[in-house]
Amino acid sequence: MEYMSTGSDNKEEIDLLIKHLNVSDVIDIMENLYASEEPAVYEPSLMTMCQDSNQNDERSKSLLLSGQEVPWLSSVRYGTVEDLLAFANHISNTAKHFYGQRPQESGILLNMVITPQNGRYQIDSDVLLIPWKLTYRNIGSDFIPRGAFGKVYLAQDIKTKKRMACKLIPVDQFKPSDVEIQACFRHENIAELYGAVLWGETVHLFMEAGEGGSVLEKLESCGPMREFEIIWVTKHVLKGLDFLHSKKVIHHDIKPSNIVFMSTKAVLVDFGLSVQMTEDVYFPKDLRGTEIYMSPEVILCRGHSTKADIYSLGATLIHMQTGTPPWVKRYPRSAYPSYLYIIHKQAPPLEDIADDCSPGMRELIEASLERNPNHRPRAADLLKHEALNPPREDQPRCQSLDSALLERKRLLSRKELELPENIADSSCTGSTEESEMLKRQRSLYIDLGALAGYFNLVRGPPTLEYG
């Protein structure tokens, strides 16, 4: 697909130039202009550690062939972030057939919610893995999002009873970038990585589980989200993006399926396409992301920055408020298998913004979808936008289970001050019916109502109803 055209008056000159080009000279020039190595992602100390691990690859392979133990592949143990990155580098740089006959699993763990036994961490005996389809849309279970580049299971450590998400990646598709960002950068709105374990020819990544599922699952099961729900989600996503962007990290795949609900927050997941820039502009060697949420500058492959994530968030906001991704209603997938050219020529998709969108939210979406990335606001700027900070009286009382219980407690306290000492005395309380009602208000009944609201809460963003 062409995005540039050459004038016809220059065509003859170009044809003549091509005829006299020496292909080998062109290749030499391009190799000098574009180094084959990926730009450095982390601080020199971490990169030096990873490079040292790479230098030992040949020795490790010879040890594997001879049947001797390799330090990185001998057991499952607790370690540091540096240990995990070295482990990831080692297994990604070693041919997968070296792992097929491994007698036992190996890996590096960062959190003690995972409990290996004598250097082992075995399925069924140490950890249970439940296919995500068995829990999907099951009211009594956790929702677990499906990863773009691997299957995701619900996992539970048998000893600690900790529930986790477990992403399975074939070793030949595994890349160090699958763990680097989550391992090196911790934030409340980024799903925490607990560790990586290699079983046979499959890498298992254990991380924080989304109790409420993904935004995409919420949309598929409940339809378009209400604006106060969108505000709640957007603020959490922007906090995560603000942190990542301050570290010059581009997520590259912001979309509903990569935003996951916890009981009191939303977190970002799936950092397999993420990179940390070493300059102000990142020049990719390939397209990164999901095309329907891609910004025009990403599609052009001429360099982009963290502002690409802001555009993707704007496209995600349209999906949340309408229940449908941008472009799809006007350009059905059956007729348009690819949206790259449409986005390049027609972005931004302002016509897809919901008709009932408030003026403030419309302004925020339009700013996020600004075609020129230099005019696009930063995550920190959007967090201050009035659309995300409505007056207190307009904010729904639905922040968390704790706030729901606190609200009920305050209500009961006020009621208790108004009650006579003996609420059973009909002369004081009026009717027996009123007395029974007051007794119920002072009982656990109200708290159970709040808990019922909590079960609604963990299946998606907070709702207005609490019982």
Swiss-Prot record:
GO biological process: MAPK cascade; positive regulation of inflammatory response; protein phosphorylation; T cell costimulation
Entry GO terms, CC: cytoplasm; cytosol
SUPFAM superfamilies: Protein kinase-like (PK-like)
Disulfide bridges in this chain: none
Location(s) in or outside the cell: Cytoplasm
Cofactors required: Mg(2+)
InterPro entries (UniProt xref): Kinase-like_dom_sf (IPR011009), MAP_kinase_kinase_kinase (IPR050538), MAPKKK8 (IPR017424), Prot_kinase_dom (IPR000719), Ser/Thr_kinase_AS (IPR008271)
Inducers of expression: Up-regulated by IL12 in T-lymphocytes. Up-regulated in subcutaneous adipose tissue of obese individuals.
SMART domains: S_TKc
Residues the record lists as Phosphoserine modifications: 141, 400, 443
Stated name of the protein: Mitogen-activated protein kinase kinase kinase 8
Natural source organism: Homo sapiens (Human)
Gene: MAP3K8
